[in-house]
């Protein structure tokens, strides 16, 4: 499982990007966030996730927020 920092996330549109520890930007969709209730991420938040190859490049799945 990779770790990274939320680069930006638009809650209205339901997506954003996570910067990995090696500097790669990975697409993040709200449906991949593993939490109950309103699924959103905050800029600068630390997260753990798996990476899958999506239709337009690397995509984060199984996103969990780190304390």
UniProtKB/Swiss-Prot annotation:
Localisation: Cytoplasm
Location, primary (coarse class): cytoplasm
Cite a GO CC annotation. cytoplasm
- UniProt keyword annotation of Cytoplasm present: yes
Where does the signal peptide begin and end? Answer: none
Question: Can you tell which superkingdom this protein's organism belongs to?
Answer: Bacteria
Description of what induces expression: In response to low temperature.
Instruction: Fill in the subunit field for this protein.
Output: Homodimer.
Q: What name is this protein filed under?
A: Major cold shock protein
Please tell me the species this chain comes from: Streptococcus pyogenes serotype M6 (strain ATCC BAA-946 / MGAS10394)
Organism lineage? Bacteria, Bacillati, Bacillota, Bacilli, Lactobacillales
């Amino acid at each position: 499982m990779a770790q990274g920092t939320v680069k930006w996330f638009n809650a209205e549109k339901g997506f954003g990007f996570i910067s990995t520890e090696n500097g790669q930007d990975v697409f993040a969709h709200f449906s991949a966030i593993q939490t109950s209730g309103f699924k959103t991420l905050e800029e600068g938040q630390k997260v753990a996730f798996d990476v899958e190859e999506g239709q337009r490049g690397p995509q984060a799945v199984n996103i969990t927020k780190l304390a």
